[in-house]
A protein has these predicted regions:
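DnaQ-like (DEDDh/DEDDy) 3′-5′ exonuclease domain used for proofreading
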Residues: 1-221, 338-339, 343-362, 366-407, ...
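Catalytic palm subdomain of template-directed nucleic-acid polymerases
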Residues: 550-570
Length: 771
């Protein structure tokens, strides 16, 4: 039997007979469990190194070698723990850190879609195949996902309820019964009832509630679980509650036990292991896709994306209100509980997060729900190609020159208030450098004849390399995705391509080398500075440059059409110049691609505060032709500044850029602030990155405020009052309006006002003497 499917989860375990891999996949015919038994864990060792092997392990000579030419042997083990013990003994091994299930898939070029050939047997509500033949295939899954959310008694360990909502799709829209299949399990003795699209079901105690939820999930059989902080809170709580009650957490397919792996290091994430079901956290997926919000709370994100939010929003009120509802009005608590699930589903649909996750897995070969993992993704793509070229790679951290490489080039800016600034941007600069200049670990180790020079004495092979070809494939795929308006795929490819430099520049990469990283970043510096010189030779000053962009001032008098003509001509001529320059200097084809990106009709480049020099990575402007305001790095774009400063600065920029009166506006805001009319805009919101007790000296204001709460979370909302910092939920004192004048409004205004030969103080001093 042949069946096309999509990998959801992957696990391995040692058995007396050898290593066993367990893969779960979804297909048009249902879930599939693939058991691959009698596998031999493998790694490599330099042939000249003597090694004492554990019983049952075998050492075989291979035709492969290390990148610098040393011949290697393969080491084959009965169990993965034997390989790990040898690795922990300090033996110098190669690729011993590659997980066996990842190696099995990557060497077959299987990423997520998979063709299964073999004998498939029905086991309950899923298929099982033992020792199937697997190969890559083009297959697009239709994931059935379930949003879950729990309610508890504040910070105690008491469980109140669990809500679960199936994400709507074409199937649920067509079937009225499926549209009403969501559920809330609630501890209590009330009558079960259908409440709109969900059913409220009461259970006598926590154990009964959890088992009812597990049974319902097994019957519903989703391919993935979703939620908001679903691993760190919901699943972690459920797993720990099961442990305390002495029951298995039967959330996996086939009733397999789910676990949550706790972090080994501070700041590391918890990892959910739910056999047969991917687990997607909405916060993590949005961040992986480079979405940006003032706050990633469910209430804030849903308001920004959907225009609606939770039924209870205030953090302090929320705990008390949930406790009250559980005591007095359980149906209302159920409404609140299921509402969170509905919001999660709607956010996933609005942001197309499942499509992004699927495309990312298709590109990288990482597990569907694994986020981060840029180094592992690089290994998945690079190692199989390296092996086929005849080489193996070292372990991570087995070699390092210990030196870093410079970051992206940021040009000194020319501060001022401008008309008509054009931005020329190098499209995917670092990937295009890798492709153009053949930056590659194998090409660095084996440069061959007539190599291409890099930096830090690096030389790169012109023809025997891997990474430039990978970039070329991804580049073409992204261009195709853009043409087909496939935004999730285009974004996923962009993220993967841009991650390659970061991977080569980190000591967590097995190929890390200062020569590799510097040959990318220092080439980028050269490209930006030489492009600046060429543009200025054409008669246009470059007022700023940042990693992959140059900002060109073309004079005050150009209209929109003239600006576009100048921008397009600079783009075309600079591309031609780079093609000719690289052909003459290195005899290579340029894959550098300059784009005319933006015309700022008005542009502001500030100084460093209190100094005459121009700042970096901070500017604002109006983009023509629709006069859209863009703010980068300034107060209006920073979430650690108050809404007061951010709103004030944006409006001030609008007035200055449109040459409208602004003095009266500044006076009005200062007056409203002093009169207490803007108090709702005075809230600071900051993240708490350490335990409160860790702050001993110079305790910052947000920690002072957090210490006044009975319980603090990872973020704190507070005001500066006449009695110091106070949390929003326990504010008793009047705001310190002078603080907000001096520390919020004045800095937000003075950056641009200095170029108009005035200041916040000059405009407001006479007025404020009345207060």
């Amino acid at each position: 039997m042949i069946l096309d499917a999509y990998l959801l989860t992957r696990h391995w375990r040692d058995t007396p007979q050898g290593l066993e891999l367990s893969l779960w996949a979804c297909s048009e015919q249902g879930a599939v469990n693939l058991l691959i038994r009698d596998q031999q864990p493998v790694c490599f060792v330099e042939r000249s190194l003597p090694l004492a092997l554990p019983a049952g392990a075998v050492r075989k000579p291979l035709t492969l070698s290390l990148l610098h030419g040393e011949a290697v042997d393969g080491l084959y083990f009965r169990q993965q723990r034997d390989l790990q013990h040898l690795r922990q003994s300090g033996a110098t091994l190669c690729e011993s850190d590659v997980k066996p299930v990842d190696r099995y898939l990557m060497e077959r070029f299987i990423r997520a879609p998979v063709r299964i050939e073999g004998d498939l047997q029905r086991v309950g509500n899923y298929w099982r195949a033992i020792q199937p033949r697997l190969q890559p295939v083009d297959f697009q899954p239709r994931l059935r996902t379930l949003a879950i959310d729990i309610e508890t008694r504040g910070h105690s360990r008491q469980l109140y309820s669990i809500a679960a909502a199936i994400m709507p799709d074409a199937t649920t829209e067509e079937d009225p019964e499926l549209r009403q299949s969501d559920v809330v399990f609630m501890i209590g003795t009330g009558e079960d009832e259908q409440r709109g699209h969900y059913r409220l079901i009461y259970q006598a105690n926590e154990k009964a509630l959890l088992n009812a939820f597990f049974n319902w999930t097994l019957e519903t059989d989703p391919d993935a679980l979703t939620g908001w902080a679903v691993v760190n809170f919901d699943l972690n709580f459920i797993v720990q509650k099961c442990q305390s009650l002495g029951i298995p957490c039967r959330l996996g397919r086939g009733g397999e036990t789910a676990t949550v792996l706790q972090p080994n290091l501070p700041g590391s994430p918890r990892i959910a292991r739910v056999p047969g079901r991917a687990v997607f956290d909405g916060i993590d997926l949005l961040k992986a896709g480079f979405w940006s919000f003032d706050s990633f709370s469910l209430d804030n994100v849903s308001h920004e994306l959907l225009g609606t939010g939770k039924l209870i929003s205030s953090e302090q009120d929320k705990v008390a209100e949930i406790n009250r509802l559980f005591k007095d009005d359980k149906p209302q608590l159920a409404d609140y509980n299921i509402r969170d699930c509905t919001l999660v589903n709607e956010i996933f649909q609005k942001a197309d997060l499942l499509a992004f996750a699927i495309q990312r897995a298709n590109l990288t070969g990482l597990a569907l729900d694994r986020l981060g993992g840029s180094v592992a993704a690089f290994d998945n793509l690079y190692l199989p190609r390296l092996h086929r070229a005849g080489y193996v790679a070292p372990d991570v951290n087995s070699r390092s020159d210990g030196l870093g490489s410079p970051g992206g080039y940021v040009m000194d800016s020319v501060p001022g208030l401008y008309k008509n600034v054009l931005v020329l941007d190098f499209k995917s600069l670092y990937p295009s450098i890798i492709r153009t200049f053949f930056i590659d670990p194998m090409g660095l180790a084996v440069p061959g004849d007539n190599p291409l020079p890099g930096f830090v004495d690096a030389m790169f092979a012109r023809d025997k390399h891997i990474l430039p070809g990978l970039i070329e494939e991804l580049w073409a795929a992204r261009d195709k995705a853009k043409l087909e308006k496939n935004a999730p795929l285009s974004q996923a490819i962009k993220i993967i391509m841009n991650s390659f430099y970061g991977v080569l520049g980190t000591t967590g990469c097995r190929f890390y080398s200062q020569q590799l990283a510097s040959s990318i970043t220092r080439r980028g510096h050269e490209i930006i500075t030489r492009s600046r010189d060429w543009i200025e030779e054409q008669g246009f000053p470059v007022i700023y440059g940042d990693t992959d962009s140059v900002f060109v001032y073309i004079g005050d008098d150009a209209n929109e059409q003239q600006s576009a003509d100048i921008g397009n001509k600079l783009m075309q001529d600079l591309n031609i110049w780079w093609q000719e320059e690289l052909r003459q200097q290195y005899d290579i084809e340029s894959h550098l691609e300059v784009e005319y990106e933006t015309h700022y009709s008005r542009f502001f480049m500030p100084t460093v505060r209190g100094m005459p020099t121009g700042s970096k990575k901070r500017y604002a402007g109006l983009i023509a032709p629709d006069s859209r305001l863009v703010v980068k790095g300034l107060e209006a774009a920073r979430t650690d500044w108050t809404p007061l400063a951010r709103n004030f600065q944006r409006e001030l920029f609008q007035r200055v850029f449109h040459e409208q009166p602004f003095e009266e506006y500044i006076r009005q805001i200062a007056e409203q602030l002093q009169a207490g009319e803007l108090d709702e805009q005075l809230i600071y919101r900051k993240r708490i990155r350490r335990a409160l007790d860790d702050y001993q000296r110079n305790v910052p204001p947000h920690i002072q405020a957090a210490r006044k709460l009975p319980h603090s979370g990872r973020t704190i909302s507070y005001l500066i009052t006449r009695n110091g910092p106070e949390p929003v939920d326990l504010q008793h004192s009047t705001p310190d309006y002078q603080h907000y004048l001096d520390k919020q409004l004045a800095p937000a205004a003075d950056g641009i006002l200095q170029f108009l030969e005035t200041s916040f103080a000059a405009i407001t001093d006479a007025q404020l003497q009345m207060f």
